[in-house]
Amino acid sequence: LRHDDIHLANATGEGNLVVLFGARTGGDGIGGASILASETFEDGMPAKRPSVQVGDPFMEKVLIECCLDLFEADVVQGIQDLGAAGISCATSELASNGDSGMHVDLENVLLRDPTLTAGEILMSESQERMMAIVTPQDRERFFEIIDKWDVEAAVIGHLTGDGRLTIDHYGHRIVDVDPKTVAHEGPVYDRPYARPAWQDELQAATSESLARPATREELIADVRAVLSDVNQASKAWVTDQYDRYVQ
């Protein structure tokens, strides 16, 4: 991809369409520690289980080739992948970068799991999804290329001139914010900090001032202490237990 063919994550042009394409939206990446901290696991309650997002290499390859075709046809005004925080992140960053407003109708999102709530749809981290800004004039050509690669897509919103990010779910307004406050002007922590006293002592130490093992047993003990330190020891007992196929 030539540098002059790079498309940025900017949403500009009032009336332009917001298109979500690629894989369908599921429950991937929702919950995590907040679910484990919940005390509500009663029968009859909605299932509370985190779902680890698992990539699909074939779908990823198809989506890459599809995007390259879209770029070559010059039917994309702006584009962004969906990663952490999913739709909530992509919409706010696109609108903020382009100094634009955006309206989204969340019910138009293609779902893999129809039981997802509005909040879950917004925060889903399902892989292999892209969000593009397309002019109404390029809509037909855009979807021709999408269909050629057998990729699913849906128009979920449009750009506005009011500078607000608004998101509705079946007529109910669930988001109405300035996108910059979400994407780039969020709260910044001003945490107290100080230089640790032990750093001065450590940096002042020399090879002559450090204790050295005098016997074989002391040397073995020192080596074992280093190897058993949590920063040095094998992490396999944790990583080998992690099930990345949790559904």
PLM feature spans:
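Glycine/proline-enriched, intrinsically flexible loops and inter-domain linkers
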Residues: 1-247
